[in-house]
Amino acid sequence: PRPQGNRLTILTNAGGPGVLATDALIRQGGELAKLAPETIAALDEFLPPHWSHQNPVDILGDADPDRYVKAVEIVAKDPNSDGLLVILTPQAMTDPTKIAEKLKAFFESAQPLLKNKTLLASWMGGEEVEAGELLLNQAGIFTFPFPDGAAQVFNYMGHYSYNLKGLYETPTLPMDEVENRSLATSVIDSVRRSGRT
């Protein structure tokens, strides 16, 4: 779905790509979602002590599939976020395909929970992560080769949603509308009585 606002949560296994996404997001008017205290506390329960403790949520380079899925499940529930960008960089302990398989299963089973959240992924690494990208695409998750591009797309989607909302909004009538209508009616009646057209 399109984002309902401009607040994005970024989850990554590497700090640098999270910063790239953050810079692109903020440069175009988006903002990092401020994670709720409950979200931070839930992440603290299972992430290593040296995780980022803020958005972007850096779950560290040794993140296995279970850590990824549990972290995604927690941040996806955060009420302060309009979207989620999951970033993966291949590292020695990373299995991009297995992580994508588990995320695909989670996304497919959690649709009611995620119905108002925009989900994007950046699976960095080219051919090495291709199989994982395909799995995420099959689950309806758009994937991008670079995190800054994903953040830009989130912003574009947010602007589009905002503009659509404006198009369908019924404008309010000014309070002096009744007086103007009366004046217009009297002018038209006067013109008709005088025989002018």
Feature locations, PLM:
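Peripheral docking tails and interdomain loops at the edges
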Residues: 1-12, 16, 22-32, 101-197
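Short glycine-cluster motifs
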Residues: 3-89, 98
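Short secondary-structure capping/turn micro-motifs that flank functional sites
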Residues: 41-42, 92, 152-153
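Short Asp/Glu-rich motifs
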Residues: 44-45, 95, 131, 155
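Short, small-residue-enriched loops and turns at beta-alpha junctions
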Residues: 91-95, 126-127
